[in-house]
Amino acid sequence: MGKRASKLKPEEVEELKQQTYFTEAEIKQWHKGFRKDCPDGKLTLEGFTKIYQQFFPFGDPSKFANFVFNVFDENKDGFISFGEFLQALSVTSRGTVEEKLKWAFRLYDLDNDGFITRDELLDIVDAIYRMVGESVRLPEEENTPEKRVNRIFQVMDKNKDDKLTFDEFLEGSKEDPTIIQALTLCDSGQA
C-alpha cells in the first residue's frame, strides 16, 4: 500500500478475503474507516491506546492496550498496518473458539516462549483489572488479580509446574467458560 494509505488494490482485497472472515464489502468499509483514523496507514501505540480509552473511560487501559498492540503488530515494526488490524479483528470477532484461544494465548505469553507463567498472567490480569476500574463488580474469590490468577492456575495447570502450555490453556478454557467470556471483550457481536 506504499507510504500513504490509498485505495485497496483488487489483489489486496482478494488476499484479505482469503486471510480473514470478512467479505469484500466489509473489507472496503473497514479500510475506509482505518484510512480516516490513520491517513498514513499506520496505527501507532498512542492511537491504539486512545481507542481503548474511549471504550474504558473509567479505568486505565494503557497497559492492556500495549499488550494487545504487541499481538496485533505481527511484524514488530512498531505500528499496526491495515492488514494486521483486519486479521486480528477477524480472529477476535469471528474466529472459531480455538482461533480465539490461540490469539489469547499469544497475548498472555508475553515473552513468546510457548508458556504462560504465573507472572505473565498476573501482568495481564492486573492490566485488565486496571482497565475496567471500578465499573465491574467481581466476586470475593476473584476481586484481586492474584486471586483470579490463582483460580486460573488451579483449573488449568494440570501438572502443577507453574506454567501453562497451550494444551493446558485450551483444556482449561473448556472447563472454565469464563475464560471464553473474557475473550468476548474483543468481540464485536458479529461472531
Swiss-Prot record:
One of its GO terms (molecular function) is calcium sensitive guanylate cyclase activator activity. It comes from the Eukaryota. InterPro entries: EF-hand-dom_pair, EF_Hand_1_Ca_BS, EF_hand_dom, Recoverin. Keywords: Calcium, Lipoprotein, Metal-binding, Myristate, Repeat. Ca(2+) 3 binds at D157, N159, D161, K163, E168. Residues 24-59, 60-95, 96-131, 144-179 form the EF-hand domain. Belongs to the recoverin family. Binds 3 calcium ions via the second, third and fourth EF-hand. This is Neuronal calcium sensor 1.
